């Protein structure tokens, strides 16, 4: 008995020690230098490695072909140059695009838009230069240069985006995203858009959205537009810091309806095309959703007259020093159109929108605005090998210049990428810079790591499996190689800054529910968290992140194994004017036509939320059936039942003599420290 008690005590102490150690261990970031709300995205970590070996639009080993392969994936490049697309391109869930691997000058995607259509995505060191060559061919209204919306878990790092038909770089309506160290330049004004003049920088927002150390240059407006989406409009939390905004036109930065936003240490530099007077001093022109707006766009009715909260400090305007001494007086308050707020802008409102402490945000290196100006100009965009266009944008910003201007426009703004053609250039001139390629390093096993690098790090260049071995650092061997290619940039860009915000520790975030919505869909009938519905193709989405379900039909949700669900909340409406729908069955229990009713989409209210406690928790699958012949639009949240006690099971396995750190990562060559081996605590001294 004494021996048994000693063993139990030892196990308890080991468990407590492991939990305590885990509580001090930060989750592994996407890569060194990944910051903000998207800091912990995993992308294609642990998945297959795919090589882009040509610059064709499609076909074997093209970028499109690589993106179309199923499963988690990391895409590396064996070639540099410009990929001229013949149709739009989308990036699916669980993908890492490692543009820094391109041998030579890097990769550019041109002619058609590229967007992110899935969850859990990392994109680094890429160029997206759309242009208007196809605006008349395919009716390119609404073509953004890059971005996406209504998904979750992205980080976009060191990308260069230019020449959009609509916005250059729009990322909004998502959960947990970061856009960092990007160069966003020269959206097109009179490019052929059916709505006429555009030339917009981007829409930025989301439920946990970070935008830091980006250069926004030569846009007529939306630099950025602080843009809520219906999916996130009641939980808009955005951190915007250390961005450089040069030669902003029109309304500059504006919007922010109902949002909570940190606007910290940004550098505003009015250029030759910027407005003078109060608009030239603008930090952000904030407002609300008005009666007129929600009448036209009823999906935004939940945020009617909702004022946001803003933490604004440390922002600098290079032309108007009074802004620097009082951000709120000159950059915020005097930018509000009180007459356009349905009479809601009162003295009390004025006091309520200004907050004295920042909203919660995830760890981000923060510089002064002046220091950020230099850092961004030195390192933003696809800066591993800057092309001539990015170099021009940097030069314009440094020198307060507008080298090229389109017909009929203020200085620095263009109608087409061809407006950048130098005088005297030949007929073979192209707006897209030449990107030279060199020979890709030899990679015998195709695991994304060159042979000589594997040799130098004690790996086997004939076995691809070692690329996905997780090291003591929390990164796979492949990730360590990918990160090493730009380690010097990462170190230099963050020097002289202070890491502010909170980090997330291992085990700190406990999942309490699963969501099935347009936002969590992976682009098909699979969803974040390992959920699946027994349908094929892609789900159609309704308003506010809902998914459309046929009437009088039973659906089966496949749940993660052995996770108990005890409560279901359904937000939704009937996708028909003047008609209702209802929930006919859930988890095997049937309901009448008046129990859980969903109103017509044109009713008032036009949606409803029902929370249903299950008679007993269900595991593995959950069924629901729509009632009436009308289509229903649902957002479904499933609460995970809490359990108490410890289930004791008998389990035997072959011995595993590998060492693991407290995050569960297998360690190939352990150094001094605490490890787990065969379930026992091992200390190497």
Locations of regions flagged by a protein language model:
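All-beta strand scaffolds that present successive hydrophobic residues in beta-strands
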Residues: 75, 97-99, 121-123, 154-157, ...
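Right-handed parallel beta-helix
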Residues: 84-208
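Extracellular calcium-associated, cysteine-rich motifs in secreted modular proteins
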Residues: 425-503
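Acidic Gly/Asp/Thr-rich repetitive segments characteristic of extracellular carbohydrate-active
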Residues: 29-75, 661-667
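Short beta-strands within extracellular/lumenal beta-sheet-rich domains
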Residues: 541-564, 606-611, 631-637
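Extracellular beta-rich repeat passengers
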Residues: 234-425
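Residue-level detector of functionally pivotal "anchor" positions at catalytic/ligand-binding pockets or at interdomain
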Residues: 641-663
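N-terminal extracellular ligand-recognition/capping segment immediately after the signal peptide
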Residues: 28, 55-64, 72-96, 102-110
